[in-house]
Amino acid sequence: MALLLASALTTSAQEKKAEPWYKTIKVSGYVMTQYQYDGKEGNEANSFNLRMARLALDGRIANDFYWKAQLQVNGNTSTLGSSPRLVDAFAEWQKYDFFMVKAGQFKRPFTFENPMHPIDQGFMGYSQNVTRLAGFNDRCGEQASNGRDIGVQIQGDLLKNAKGRALVHYQLGVFNGQGINTKDEDQRKDIIGGAWVM
């Protein structure tokens, strides 16, 4: 019994003490530029664009919680469209790698590409089917939503190999189905999930 108690005390003493939440805040951002060319006869066009700029704040609370808020400004539009707009605003409980809970407005776990960061896409944008199906720029006549929605999601990494790399990742969420910055208008929810073998 004494050995068990000593082990528990040693383990709790070794846990990393959480920094105050305000000391973990990070400011980041990026600007994406674009060049488009169309050589169709009668419809020739070529142009440089400032596609978008994003500014993000993120941080941790008590080591177990991660949060993020991100704004987007669209570039080279005559009216700025729906810009500036809030694209991410969420908190995620991350105590365990195998079971995390996220709530707020964030990327839907639909398709392989949608959850990926735009910078990880390289020079190419998302494929046309992903931009349509995940709700980037066509939502059956509804607003564009950058592949995001408001909801709650569980996710985790399973079956780690000898080097600690997860072999399976899963995500399952319930979302309003209306896109970003919009309440649920039809009272029906989207249930979206996936499992990735890596």
Predicted segments, located by residue:
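Cleavable N-terminal export/targeting peptides
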Residues: 1-18
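Outer membrane beta-barrel
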Residues: 16-38, 42-180, 185-192, 196-198
